Amino acid sequence: MKYLEVTFTTHPCNETVNDVVSALAGEIGFESFVECEGGIQAYIQQTLFDEEALKEMVANFPLPDTRIEYTIKEAEDKNWNEEWEKNFFQPIVIGDRCCIHSTFHKDTPKTEYEILINPQMAFGTGHHETTSSIISELLEADLKGKSVLDMGCGTSILAILASMRGANPVTAIDIDDWCVNNSKDNIALNHIHNITVELGDANLLKGRKAFDVIIANINRNILLADLPHYAACMHPGSEIFMSGFYIQDIPFIREKAESLGMEFVHHREKNNWAAVKFIMK
């Protein structure tokens, strides 16, 4: 899976400007951000990159007296296992109940749920606020014996946790073949046998039997586009957990979900990132 690295140089360079850059870039497909000298670096899959959308974003930047410049290059291919070991990548503990770590970690904290992953890329490892927020939701949800769908599964951390918490069966779907292959590796690493991994998008859901629980940690635009597909495979009482967007995006998600017959339950916030829960009426 190839990524592009776009370096935004912001004038002035401050937290507010960088937060707005990240929010707007996230809406056009960028999925990871790193602060750098003079601005912020953003990463996007090459196949999803739309430079016209990027130019429009910069041209219509909403903050007054602000100038944005950018450069584009291919993100460096690295052996992420080696890089993370070298940089002392630490296990992630969420809610004192779930520890996510890799095979090279020793003496990890003992928690109720332990998820092993092989970090073969920079993204999808459980560090992001959206992933940890959905994990917190799953730790509180009643999943025993329930059918679960993980859309945009990435490394399948969420699908794996759902299975560990008693969900059965579990379906994990991603549009990227690398994610599908890495998901299968991680599922095997955790000795899980009831997760089916599929390559594709929300169109795969047509004609499916309804799921009891849906997880979708993607981004605002894809969620808004795909919510009708999700609604079509939910029954009264089905729950859906969504993340991948900012607090200010909740009204857009809520309006769309409620128009499809869903009832808003609650949201949680972490560093301005949001996770929401709805139930189908």
Curated annotation (Swiss-Prot):
Disulphide bridges in this chain?
none
Q: What is its EC number?
A: 2.1.1.-
Among the GO biological process terms of this entry, one is:
methylation
UniProt KW Plastid keyword: no
Which key words are in the record? Cytoplasm, Methyltransferase, S-adenosyl-L-methionine, Transferase
InterPro entries, per database record: Ribosomal_L11_MeTrfase_PrmA, Ribosomal_PrmA_MeTrfase, SAM-dependent_MTases_sf
GO terms (molecular function) for this protein are: protein-lysine N-methyltransferase activity
UniProt entry tagged with the keyword S-adenosyl-L-methionine: yes
Write out the residues that bind S-adenosyl-L-methionine.
Answer: T131, G152, D174, N217
Which GO CC annotations does the UniProt entry carry?
cytoplasm
Q: Where in the cell is it found?
A: Cytoplasm
Catalysed reaction per UniProt? Answer: L-lysyl-[protein] + 3 S-adenosyl-L-methionine = N(6),N(6),N(6)-trimethyl-L-lysyl-[protein] + 3 S-adenosyl-L-homocysteine + 3 H(+)
Q: What does this protein do?
A: Methylates ribosomal protein L11.
Query: What family name appears in the similarity comment?
Result: Belongs to the methyltransferase superfamily. PrmA family.
Read off the NCBIfam families from this record: PRK00517.2-2 (NF001785)
Which HAMAP family does the entry mention?
Methyltr_PrmA (MF_00735)
- Spell out the protein name for this chain: Ribosomal protein L11 methyltransferase
Which species does the entry assign this protein to? Phocaeicola vulgatus (strain ATCC 8482 / DSM 1447 / JCM 5826 / CCUG 4940 / NBRC 14291 / NCTC 11154)
Please state the gene responsible for encoding this protein.
prmA
